[in-house]
Amino acid sequence: MRKVKPKLNLTSQTARIVNLSHDGRGIARVNGKATFIQGALPGEMVEFQYTRVKKDFDEGKLLSIIEPSTLRVEPKCPHYQMCGGCSLQHMSAEEQIRFKQSHLLDLLSRYGHTEPQSMLSPLTSHHWNYRNKARLSTRFVEKKQSTMVGFRERNNPRFITEINQCPILNSKIDTDIVHLRKLIDTMEDKQCIAQIEVAAGDNEVALIFRNLTPLTEQDELKIRKFAEQFQYKVFLQPGGLDSVFCFYPSDAHAYLSYELPDYQITFQFHPNDFTQVNAELNRKMVTQAIQLMELKNSDIVLDLFCGLGNFSLPMAKHCSRVIGVEGNKNMVERAYMNAKSNHITNVDFYAANLDDVMEVRNLVNTSFSKVLIDPPRSGALEIVKQIDSIDPERIVYVSCNPITLARDTDILVNQKGYVLITAGVMDMFPHTAHVESIALFQKG
């Protein structure tokens, strides 16, 4: 028998916000049931309207704030209420950090069944114009006869938020979004460009145009003029990821670069490569990871999910040898290229299935005193399950998902005999609910 959906009560309601959810929404208790309200802060009395009724929880739209929190600030971005690029601009920067640290500790306790012996001071950076990588959606709207360029709407991802600026994006893109819109407005095929990937190095910014159909000669000319006038490297992507090529300048090499000045290392990367979005925070993160490793000249270090060598190369300057293992062959090639260009010879890189520790052990037949793990959001479950085959004395775990960090912590601490010495948050994505963290485990 078909279930009847509960009817929404569209009359306005009032409630006191008692907490924040993991994604930064305010939580109210209405008739004993949790109601999630975007934009509300703990302690506030708010007026809201129900938008969804579920069995275990409800969702509501914030209508007004009757009693505001002292933690509330005015969002800097004029598009904040609609745009899905941010979710915490209404919260003070200091409170954002406290929220993320509390969330990390809660998950470590609830799912990791432990707590760190000490907490690291949070790593922070500039809160604005920090984001060096982003994917912007584009769409020409016939009714308006204009192009929309921006992030998806927060409450309706089918739609694009029409933005004129973005204070979290790299400052050059923040300024030039309007010009990007004008470019597509003038093209012969205004529906051709589906999205624009932004990738910024220390000195250059690249744009990858995802073109659904071949560009006309006139449109190619317009893109070249745009790139020349506003000083961009432009790449085109007519098909899959392997179809990306440098369109302008036609004689340019395909790489951008960023530096780790403390280690006198320069990394080259393709705009499609994975790199950290926040360059300032990345520099601080690398330094903190190396400090936590307490590297000695005799150490042989295993760097899992090593990417293009972001941790491997600076670590190599402080120990005997580093072995980096990565699942993506292209990134392994990039890591070798960066090692060579920086004259670092005590590193080796391998491509392997990182869900199969025995494959890694067969490739790398040596023992390791220390391991650095920097996995994707899915975490490092298979690695921590089989950590006995590596048996390091010290593990530094860099996480972009506190839920999988907590899960893996439970295994390391409660099954494998490690102690969670310290942990802390890294504010890689200010004004969002994303929690990046770092943790140190020592063999008990």
UniProtKB/Swiss-Prot annotation:
EC number(s) per UniProt? 2.1.1.190
Boundaries of every TRAM domain copy: 5-64
One GO MF term on file is: rRNA (uridine-C5-)-methyltransferase activity
Instruction: State where [4Fe-4S] cluster binds.
Output: 77, 83, 86, 166
GO biological process terms on file: rRNA base methylation
Catalytic reaction list: uridine(1939) in 23S rRNA + S-adenosyl-L-methionine = 5-methyluridine(1939) in 23S rRNA + S-adenosyl-L-homocysteine + H(+)
Q: Which domain of life is it from?
A: Bacteria
One Pfam family named in its UniProt record: tRNA_U5-meth_tr
InterPro entries recorded for this chain? 23S_rRNA_MeTrfase_RlmD (IPR001566), MeTrfase_TrmA_AS (IPR030390), MeTrfase_TrmA_CS (IPR030391), NA-bd_OB-fold (IPR012340), SAM-dependent_MTases_sf (IPR029063), TRAM_dom (IPR002792), U5_MeTrfase_fam (IPR010280)
- Key words, A-Z: 4Fe-4S, Iron, Iron-sulfur, Metal-binding, Methyltransferase, rRNA processing, S-adenosyl-L-methionine, Transferase
Chain sites annotated for binding S-adenosyl-L-methionine: 276, 305, 310, 326, 353, 374
Q: Does the keyword rRNA processing apply?
A: yes
CDD domains for the chain: AdoMet_MTases
Q: Which residues form the active site?
A: 400
* Function comment: Catalyzes the formation of 5-methyl-uridine at position 1939 (m5U1939) in 23S rRNA.
Q: Which HAMAP family match?
A: 23SrRNA_methyltr_RlmD
Family stated for the protein in its record: Belongs to the class I-like SAM-binding methyltransferase superfamily. RNA M5U methyltransferase family. RlmD subfamily.
Q: State the protein's name.
A: 23S rRNA (uracil(1939)-C(5))-methyltransferase RlmD
Q: What is the lineage of its organism?
A: Bacteria, Pseudomonadati, Pseudomonadota, Gammaproteobacteria, Legionellales
